C-alpha cells in the first residue's frame, strides 16, 4: 500500500508538471486528467472518500470543460510537442524548483503543525468528511451558489480571452 501511495504522489507531481509546462492546450488536458485522477486516488487511499469524489467531479466536470473550450477556440496549426527544447527547459526548471522545495521542506518538516486524522484520532464514530456533507447542503448553500456563478463568469472570461481578435477556430460564416 505504501508503494501505491508513493506511486500516486509521483503521478500527481508529474501531472502538475505536465500542466505547468504544457506546450499547447492539447497536452495540458492530459496533464490535468493525470493530476486529478492521481490526487483523488491519493485522497481515496487515505480514507477521505467524499472529498475525493467531490474534487474528482469538480476537476473533470468543470476544469476539463474550460480546457475543451480553450482548445476549440484556439486551434494551433503547429502545436509544440513534449520534445521541443523550450518545453524541456520548462520541465527541467520545474523539477529543479521541486527538488529545492523538497530540500528546504526537509529542514522545516521536523516541526509539528498539529494535523489530525480524518476520524479525529478515533474520537468520533462518524468521520469528519461525512459530517461536512450536511454542513455543505445546509449552511453552505449560499456560498455554493456564489461559487457556481463565479465559475460561470470565469468560463465566459476564459472564452473571451482565448478568442481575442482572431476569433480562434470559430469563423464567421
Swiss-Prot record:
An annotated Gene Ontology molecular function: NADH dehydrogenase (ubiquinone) activity
Top-rank lineage group of the source organism: Eukaryota
Main localization (coarse): mitochondrion
EC identifiers of the protein: 7.1.1.2
Reactions performed catalytically: a ubiquinone + NADH + 5 H(+)(in) = a ubiquinol + NAD(+) + 4 H(+)(out)
Transmembrane segments: 1-21, 27-47, 48-68, 87-107, 139-159
Signal peptide feature range: none
The keyword Translocase is annotated on this UniProt entry: yes
EC primary class: translocase
Membrane topology: Multi-pass membrane protein
Keyword Transcription: no
GO CC terms, sorted: mitochondrial membrane
Location within or outside the cell: Mitochondrion membrane
Keywords in alphabetical order: Electron transport, Membrane, Mitochondrion, NAD, Respiratory chain, Translocase, Transmembrane, Transmembrane helix, Transport, Ubiquinone
Function: Core subunit of the mitochondrial membrane respiratory chain NADH dehydrogenase (Complex I) that is believed to belong to the minimal assembly required for catalysis. Complex I functions in the transfer of electrons from NADH to the respiratory chain. The immediate electron acceptor for the enzyme is believed to be ubiquinone.
Family: Belongs to the complex I subunit 6 family.
Protein name: NADH-ubiquinone oxidoreductase chain 6
Species annotation: Ptychoramphus aleuticus (Cassin's auklet)
